[in-house]
């Protein structure tokens, strides 16, 4: 019980202490589409739909889970990861085993990231993992401070648009979930992004006609991209969005 209480305090600290501040310098609003865990449908449907519109996404992969089966989806295969990379999509880090970072030491976290990078380099060749997403959205303040040094950005699951001076240690997102993203909400969020010259990061998981609670249908993904492009918004992966906001990407 005490351990759980301490973990909750650490998690709240990670959320409320902005630790990697950067003032956005983008000239126009930005939208990024990201996929966590990467079910195989995010490859077969998600990536294919993005490519229909000339859009590239960021796919946060825990390579140790490739080819595994869960309660809601089958995880992408190593070959599919390689194809995503070869087609120009960004591969992001999601730890090796989709670990709960609140429960890991600094050494264990480093091993998770190193193993993931090493395996993805064997799969993809020259891939560089420069951006990270916290598995389950969980992170302690200590692990946040550790990971923000290793990666250009770390993304969570806290809802919101990234505007003005942002925390690159805990980027905000908007759920691209069929259960929660209505046309009215989409229009409101996109208008807010335009009004504040923001960076809107969508995140989802599976892309199927019967999505999980944390996934979306192909029609929702397609209509979202259509709406974004109709408003003239720039759609780029996280790595390219960082350049557009003026972050000194290597």
Predicted regions, residues:
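Generic enzyme active-site microenvironment
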Residues: 32-35, 92, 203-204, 235
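Histidine-centered catalytic micro-motifs
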Residues: 91-98
